[in-house]
Every structure is written in structure tokens, then in C-alpha cells.
Amino acid sequence: MMTLTGIIFGTMSCSTNVYDEEEYEKIIRYLSPVDSVDQRHTWMLTDSRMYQFNANAGSGITSVMVFTENPLLADTRAELINQASVKKGESASMMLCVPYAQDSLYAALVDSKGNYYVTAFAAGTREVDISDETVKAIGVPTVSIPTQTFTYLFEENFPEAGDYDYNDLVMRISTERTGKKELTIHVTIVAVGSDRQLAGALRLVGRRYEDIQTVGTIGAESFNDGVPEGSRYVFDNTDMLVQGNNGEAVINLFIDAHWAMTFDAYVEYGLFTRKKYNVSTSSGGDYQLRSTRTVSYVVTFKNETGLDNFTQAMLDPFVMAEYNGNVWETHLDAYRDAQILYDYPSPSTKVLPWALMVPARDFRHPLEGKEIGFRKKTPEGVVALFGAYMTEGHSFGEWVENYTTCRDWYKYPTENQVW
């Protein structure tokens, strides 16, 4: 991959590099694997919406829950999006993070005996009446219902062009309200396809450092347990809660993604060799298959203000890597200019993103070297779809060119190109 360092930074002195935005835009577009990018793109597959739920069914009602599917089906794949306390005759308002590809949702009033009074409603409906007339099923779920989980995909090369397999770091994150002033955030490292050190953190968007009472983990686990001194050069702070440049609260996830996924104090007598984890179909050479690793963070706030409406959209997970003598952060496109822990020039060019948030707990990330999927003219002038998500009418490449289409692309993997 052509390096941009010498092109976008003009040397003015032995110690100072000046960022050249115009040259950067020329080169990054030249290296792009797509012919065009919709300049309206936000690279979001979800929308945060406020809903009102009117509790008019059952008796002894204690709460209302909202699910992606019917939670009472025996083979349900439902996820809990959000919940709120409510009594019969009352209304509850909730912010929901709704995938654009989701046409319908399910609301359930829950009584003191654990019975669910379930009704379906169109995702575009903002006021939902749950009454004896609208309830379609009553019962108790026969399976445990997980909370809504999103998959986050990162390219390691920001601000340079990547290889667009989006597997340099893959995480799954879910949140649940576990107390009046408490959120529990579950973070799972699924894959590390990078061969260099990456650190990771999670900003609580709009939440100040001083708003947080404590941050701990279930079982006192940490991705930074036993991390060697030699791994502390990208981000050397092992405190679980740190303060961002703008005063916002930031959870320190890990200072070395490879160590976080593979930690074992007795492996190789403390010597640590980086491999690429879970981006191949078998172990061997530089590649290794490993179990995923999860740490659950318990965040206690000083007050409960706004927690009823806390959604996944208020999480800003990002990675940090060294580049051109500095440390650069890779965020979702919506937060690309955030610069939470480090300062650096921020490109404004609208090109392919370096990070994606996919509203799926079981998203299958591309194998190493397999691009996520693009639509491009061949040398013969024929427009072709290719990559790990290339199903016509449901492809990543078509979504790149028109942000209003193919918002369900993540449901259509190419079998031999995904993990």
C-alpha cells in the first residue's frame, strides 16, 4: 500500500510536519477501490428515535420492553432494545436505536408475575398503544433474551487508505440498564486482523468525566490484566476511567488488542508474539483461531438523568495506533473529528470510512484480504460487484454509491469470504 506520509505532510523543519489537505484528498481518492461515494453518506445503519408506549393491558404491570422480534416464540432471535418502568394506565417514553432494515418491532408489558403482553408495531410508528385489543400474545419467554448487540469493525490505517476487509479489529458491544444509576456495557473482542499494536477505548458521548461515580468490571476482569511494560507505548494509561480532551468520560478498554484477546500469564514465559486472530479459516503461520473474550463494565453514574434514553448511538468506541510520529484515533465516521485523547489533523474528505457499526450480534466479518464488497467498472467497462458482501440488490457496494439503498447488506454474506 502506498504510504501517504511523505505526500500529505510537507516538511518545514526537522521537527515539524504540516498537514496538506489538498494533496491528501488527491491521493486518498486515487487509492480508493470504488468509483464513487455518495457524498450524503453518514455510514449509519440505524436511526435513534423517540417512542411513546401507553400501558393499557393486563394487571400488575411493572415495565415495558421493546424487542426486535416476538420474544415468546420458541425459536425467537429477539433482542431487547430498551425497557422502562411503567404502571397500567401510564405512558413511558423511550429512545430506541432502530436498524433501517427493521420494518417492525415488538413491545411487551410485563407484569409482577413475569407475564409478557406482546404487540407488534411498525418501526415508523412513534406512539404505541398496548391494550387488550392490540395484544397478540401473552406468556413467558422460554429462552433467555439477550440485549441488542452491535458489531464494530475497524481499519487500522487511518488516515491512510486501508485494505477494506474491516477486520483489523472486530468488537461486539451491548448495553443494559442494571440499576437506577447503573449501566452495564458488555465488550467482546472477536477478531484482531492487524499485525501492529492497537489500543482501544470507549467514549460515553455527552457524559462528563465528573458525571461518573465508579467504573468496575464483573469479576474484576480487565483486558489490561498483566499487560507487559513493552505494550504501553501507544496508550500508557491503565486506569479504567479516563478523562477526554473535552472533559467527556472515556472507558479505557485495552492498551494492546493482541494481548487483550490472548492474555495468559504463563504463555511462552512472558514472551509475546503477535498473530492475526480469527481472520482465517484455520490456524497456521501468522494466523490463529482463538476464543472470543468478553469483559463487562459496570458504570455507576452520580444521577440517573437521561439513562432511560441511553442507546448504542451514544457509544463511541475507537482505536488508537501510531502514525507519522503521533497517535491517531479511528472513530466511526459520525465521530471522526472527535480527537478524544490525542490531537492530530482531521481530514474532511468524504471517502470510505475506517470504521463501521453493524446492527447485528452475529455479523460475519470478512476474512483477511477479502474486501468487504464494492461495485466498480472492470477494465472492460463492465460494472461488477465483488467482495464479502456483494449480493445484487443487497450489496455493500451499492450502499456506498447510494446511502438510501441496500441498508440490509450485512445480512447477505458471500460464504467463502467471511469468518
Q: Which stretches of residues belong to each language-model region?
A:
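C-terminal motif of bacterial Sec signal peptides marking the signal peptidase cleavage site
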Residues: 10-13
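Acidic/polar, low-complexity intrinsically disordered N-terminal segments immediately downstream
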Residues: 16-161
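Structural beta-strand segments of beta-rich domains
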Residues: 47-49, 181-185
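Asparagine-centered strand-capping/turn motif at beta-strand->loop junctions
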Residues: 55, 189-193
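Extended low-complexity, serine/threonine- and proline-enriched intrinsically disordered segments
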Residues: 58-75, 195-233, 238-240, 314-328
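Short, intrinsically disordered low-complexity segments
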Residues: 88-103, 109-111, 220-277, 281
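Low-complexity, acidic Ser/Thr/Pro/Gly-rich terminal tails and inter-domain linkers that flank the onset
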Residues: 157, 161-179
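A eukaryote-biased signal for long
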Residues: 246-419
